[in-house]
Structures are given as structure tokens and as C-alpha cells.
């Protein structure tokens, strides 16, 4: 019998559908709540060769994926795909390279460069997003130079290196 591991933090509707479809095909599912595991290469006993990474948390999912890859388990999506998808700027670069239509975008690291990038994109409005993160957190629609300066000043004061990377995207 085939066994597939499902790496998760929460079983949502999609995971329930995957589990149901696997049962119909006589595929054994091993549910692995990554929050409850000890990932140690010397002691971990793995009884599946393929895993689906379905964690809500990018950090937990990435670490679990890299662990299972290190012990020879094929993980879908693998860590290379995850590293592209977890960063909006990198994702946009890959999509553009593959000729997938995307809104114009730029990555800058200071207000002066942000102004130049926005001018090159055709002006306001734009959206500023953190390169890392999900669920629409910390994004801002910027309608003019005053809003741009205010948002970038706030990001600068927050102090986190992630807040000092400005992923700017054309508003569509």
C-alpha cells in the first residue's frame, strides 16, 4: 500500500478533501502535525516516501520540508519551490521570466529609490507590501507622495530588516 505523509499545522477543508480522495484510492495517509514532532535525523522514524507540505505557517512548513528532504523523503512542494513562493519579489521575478503577465513591480531599499521606481512604473497609485508574509498583512495602497513618505517612515522606525525592503507593485 502507498503511504503519503501530510505535513500540517491545521487540518482545513482542502486537507480533508485530500484525505478523502486518498482513501478512495486506497492510499494510506499519515498526518504529521509539525508542531508536535521532534525533527532529529538520528531518531526520527519515517514510514512514508512522499509528503505533501500543507502547513499554514511558512516557517514551520519550510523547516519540516527541509528536514524530510534531508532524510530522503520527496516533498511536494519541495524547498526550492517554497523558497520562491515565500517571497513576493522572487515570485514576481520568476513569473515575469516565465512570461506570465504580472503587474509592474520593483524592490527598493530607501525612499529616494521608491520615488524613482514609482515614476518608472507610471506613477501612483501603487501598493507597497513586505516581501515576506501573507494574509495581506502590512500592505498599503499608496495614492500620492505624502502617503508614500509616511508609510516608508513608519517602516523605517519599525526597525526590522524586513521592513526596510520595499516591494512596490503597480496598483491594478
Feature locations, PLM:
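Short catalytic-loop micro-motif centered on adjacent basic/acidic residues
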Residues: 5-6, 51-53, 77, 103-105, ...
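A conserved helix-loop-beta module that forms one wall/lid of the active-site cleft
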Residues: 27-32, 68-138
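Solvent-exposed alpha-helices and their adjacent loops that cap or buttress functional pockets
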Residues: 44, 119-120, 131-133, 159-161, ...
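Phosphate-binding site of ATP-dependent enzymes
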Residues: 140-172
